[in-house]
Design a protein with these regions (language model features):
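Short juxta-domain linker segments that transition from a proline/glycine-rich
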Residues: 1-264
Length: 264
């Protein structure tokens, strides 16, 4: 299983990669000095510094892919199906592949993976981590969390991010007073596709046979709405949980789209 060693390496770092955060913060400060529009600033950086333009293509031209790098045309091609948060993330992901390559290469080598598949998955996780850190720079994000009382929906609006992007970012706050969060993503069958304990050490991340009354499951009955729940375990410990459904980007109008529940 190529995923298992990747999960072990992420948990070894408690899903906090300080070098990537530092690089993303520095770059975010540079980009925001000239523009309040992060997507526009990233696009300008790609164009001026790396000779890559961003082109939004209709679904008829990109019927399957949501993101494609065309080096011959020097274009990062994005599907029109991507919402603004996903477009910014895709642009930040591409910029990270170029400007954070040193930090990412070092972390991948330190993982000592025996399979190339695991190495590729880990590299993708680190690239995604950098993209999220560029959209939600560490210190600025922690201050916003404290100022808003960790209001996830307000954080989404403030940083132009999606619910799942904010949820994942919350699991990375292992320094500077960040509260310990975990994150789980499941499908309707209860199969998990993302599990991050972060600094929480929550047993809920590894729990098998999860209760159907759990907010993570009941969120499917209230799609798009935030479900809140206080969970008490057999040992007396209690965990406050938020859950909401999310759907992956893509798919034409009328098509059945996969749905997941994300809980923190």
């Amino acid at each position: 299983d190529p995923i298992a060693p990747v999960r072990r390496e992420i948990e070894r770092w408690r899903n906090h990669f300080g070098d990537l955060d530092a690089a993303a913060e520095t770059l975010a400060d540079e980009l925001r000095m000239g523009s309040g529009d992060l997507y526009g600033a990233i696009a300008e950086r790609l164009r001026v510094t790396h000779q890559l333009s961003i082109r939004i293509l209709p679904v008829d031209v990109m019927p399957v892919a949501l993101r494609r790098l065309d080096l011959h045309a020097r274009q990062l091609q994005l599907s029109e199906l991507l919402d603004p948060a996903s477009r910014t993330f895709a642009a930040a992901f591409q910029l990270g592949q170029i400007e954070a390559i040193g930090e990412i290469d070092s972390l991948v080598k330190g993982g000592s993976f025996t399979e190339r598949a695991s190495e590729r998955l880990y590299r993708r996780h680190l690239n995604s981590y950098f993209a999220a850190a560029l959209m939600m720079p560490y210190r600025r994000f922690v201050r916003a969390c404290e100022a808003t009382g960790y209001d996830v929906e307000l954080l989404q609006r403030r940083f132009g991010a999606g619910f799942e992007q904010v949820a994942h970012r919350l699991t990375t706050l292992q320094r500077a007073r960040g509260l310990p969060f975990f994150m789980i993503r499941i499908d309707r069958a209860g199969q998990s596709s993302k599990r991050y304990a972060g600094a929480s050490a929550s047993p809920l991340v590894e729990a098998e046979g999860r209760c159907p009354l759990w907010a993570l499951h009941s969120a499917f009955d209230r799609p798009g709405r935030l479900v809140r729940q206080l969970v008490e375990l057999d040992d007396g410990r209690r965990w406050f949980m938020l859950a909401r459904t999310v759907s992956p980007q893509g798919g034409r109008i009328g098509q059945v789209r996969a749905q997941f529940s994300v809980g923190i």
